[in-house]
Amino acid sequence: MSDDLALQGKRALVTGGTKGIGAAVVSALREAGATVLTTARSQPAQLAHADQFVTADVSTAAGCAMVAQAVGERLGGLDILVHVVGGSSAPAGGFAVLDDQEWQKALDQNLFAAVRLDRALLPAMLAQGSGVIIHITSIQRQLPLPDATIAYAAAKAALSNYSKALSKEVSPKGVRVVRVSPGWVETDGAVGLVEDIARQHGTDYEGSRKIVMDSLGGIPLGRPAQPKEVADLVAFLASARAASITGTEYVIDGGTVPTV
């Protein structure tokens, strides 16, 4: 690996790092040489580097405080912060069934987790005059889907706007802030969804895949992204090769978003 892509000696935190995009990001950063602390609400039964894992719910203020404390105790500081945690657990039924509690859950998980951790960890980055913060948003922030994900889409739009504003404030002080906006990514959870749709529609996996792609308005590349592709982009953005990149959002969606 070329020196400007290497992350030897760098200390990283990845939230939501035990599965899907998060697990791929953890692997990519470690392969590049970084020491990576990761966190999730529960610890998998078999987890490599279990000593570099914190069980915490970062959708809560207490969980964020616990993770921030662990960063200081186990890493002694931070160079790279990747916010992967997010998602939606809202019931189907559209806007009418989403009460204040569901909206608050979406905001806590997809916006406030990042805000609280940034607030706790940024001061040390600013003091050292360097660091990278990467917020994982979603193409739904500009291409929202109906039904259960309306609050999720709104929260991701807020995260994107917050991230851009933060970059303007802290970039002059040496801390870069970047956004990565995935479209459909073929995680284990996504595979399970496709298999469920296949059973419901009496089709095979490829037929079900097409149903999902059509629901997004089509994917010009003809396939979803893989978690490793998103992780490789994150690792690049965390590296010295991206030293002049800040305040930008990188869309990785196979061409799904139809606008410029």
Q: What spans do the regions from the language model cover?
A:
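Short C-terminal tail/terminal secondary-structure segment
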Residues: S2-D4, A92, L143, R223, ...
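Catalytic loop of short-chain dehydrogenase/reductase
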Residues: I134-A158, S163-P172, W184-V185
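Short, small/polar-rich loop/turn modules that mediate ligand/substrate recognition or access, typified
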Residues: S171, R176, I245-G247
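Alpha-helical segment proximal to the catalytic Tyr-Lys
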Residues: P123, K168-E169, A243
